[in-house]
Amino acid sequence: MGAALLCSFAHAEVVPLDRVVAIVDNDVIMQSQLDQRLREVHQTLLKRGAPLPPEHVLTQQVLERLIIENIQQQIGDRSGIRISDEELNQAMGTIAQRNGMSLEQFQTALTRDGLSYADAREQVRREMVISRVRQRRVAERIQVSEQEVKNFLASDMGKIQLSEEYRLANILIPVPEAASSDVIQAAARQAQELYQQLKQGADFGQLAISRSAGDNALEGGEIGWRKAAQLPQPFDSMIGSLAVGDVTEPVRTPGGFIILKLEEKRGGSKMVRDEVHVRHILLKPSEIRSEAETEKLAQKLYERIQSGEDFGELAKSFSEDPGSALNGGDLNWIDPEALVPEFRQVMNDTPQGELSKPFRSQFGWHILQVLGRRATDSSEKFREQQAVSVLRNRKYDEELQAWLRQIRDEAYVEIKQ
């Protein structure tokens, strides 16, 4: 979203005459909206060098996308989803950073391109509303069973996707095809000389830049993250025994002699993680309780807890998190990385035994209390969490498309000719 925002509005212009092109439930889509989106799509396709479909086909596709977005926007409005100015300002700041600018520079860039910063904010606000609608209507309903996780972990696909990954760099000393034995021996001596320099502490990246014939030499030999199964023999069997920072002895390959360095590894191995025991109260804005009223209620509950009332009892009475309310808001021991950023940040900043002030996340208003912290070997748990994440993402894509078809079928849509 952020990287494309500048070009998204890049050709906005005043349309002297406007008309309704579609009625969508209680709202309408105007010709000017359709024309602007068509210009954006044209610009995107041209930048990619992609062929443009026939104009009538493209117009139909873009109008259908606008209809689906409009339906989701109306669902958000009816559900009381509101984006505060603070959240919107934070989102705009993030977009500016992704474009390598300060917020002021970003505003100037928009103005220079003839764009309205207010229009840009409104587009981002709509996208945030739609994201939260999808979170509530689709993501929160997805369930992954323990049996599904077990089946995935036992499958070949699961083993491949969750196996250990290695960040590698290499140095290649080339050997031409049909090389003589003298040439091969000279290359072997050169590779062995470099290996000895590395064992004595020479910088791998510098040697790669100056001596490697690989196409990644100027990047210090970096080849990125790889799984063992993605490596050619014999590296696939060698890599597991290396410690981070180790280099292999020169290995003869069809292209020459290769020295491999293990820069970093992740997944698969023993993993010690910090866990936090936390409980919270969640209050969600809705059609019958506005954003301001929800924030006010959160503040009142915070004051009541500070005055000595029992956190757990108030959570049972007021919290709208179905997974924890009946347990007094207790989320038990949890990996901070499994939480949304806003919740994680406040939790990390709250001392053990202390209460946070009310704060907002994408789910609503929270009050949290940190009950304990510990470090634990969570290798197996982490693999299970990874499996859940893979399965949830897979289900989400399927469920989202089904839900979009459903709301489109249920909506009243009249397209004007």
Swiss-Prot record:
GO terms for biological process: chaperone-mediated protein folding; Gram-negative-bacterium-type cell outer membrane assembly; protein stabilization. Residues 163-264, 273-372 form the PpiC domain. The lineage of its organism: Bacteria, Pseudomonadati, Pseudomonadota, Gammaproteobacteria, Pseudomonadales. Chaperone involved in the correct folding and assembly of outer membrane proteins. Recognizes specific patterns of aromatic residues and the orientation of their side chains, which are found more frequently in integral outer membrane proteins. May act in both early periplasmic and late outer membrane-associated steps of protein maturation. Keywords: Chaperone, Isomerase, Periplasm, Repeat, Rotamase, Signal. The gene is surA. It is found in: Periplasm. HAMAP family: Chaperone_SurA. The PPIase activity resides only in the second parvulin domain. The N-terminal region and the C-terminal tail are necessary and sufficient for the chaperone activity of SurA. The PPIase activity is dispensable for SurA to function as a chaperone. The N-terminal region and the C-terminal tail are also required for porin recognition. Its main location: periplasm. InterPro entries: OMP_Chaperone_SurA (IPR050280), PPIase_dom_sf (IPR046357), PPIase_PpiC (IPR000297), PPIase_SurA (IPR023034), SurA_N (IPR015391), Trigger_fact/SurA_dom_sf (IPR027304). This is Chaperone SurA. The keyword Isomerase applies. It comes from Pseudomonas aeruginosa (strain ATCC 15692 / DSM 22644 / CIP 104116 / JCM 14847 / LMG 12228 / 1C / PRS 101 / PAO1). GO terms for cellular component: outer membrane-bounded periplasmic space. It catalyses: [protein]-peptidylproline (omega=180) = [protein]-peptidylproline (omega=0). GO terms for molecular function: peptide binding; peptidyl-prolyl cis-trans isomerase activity; unfolded protein binding. Its EC number is 5.2.1.8. The keyword rRNA-binding does not apply.
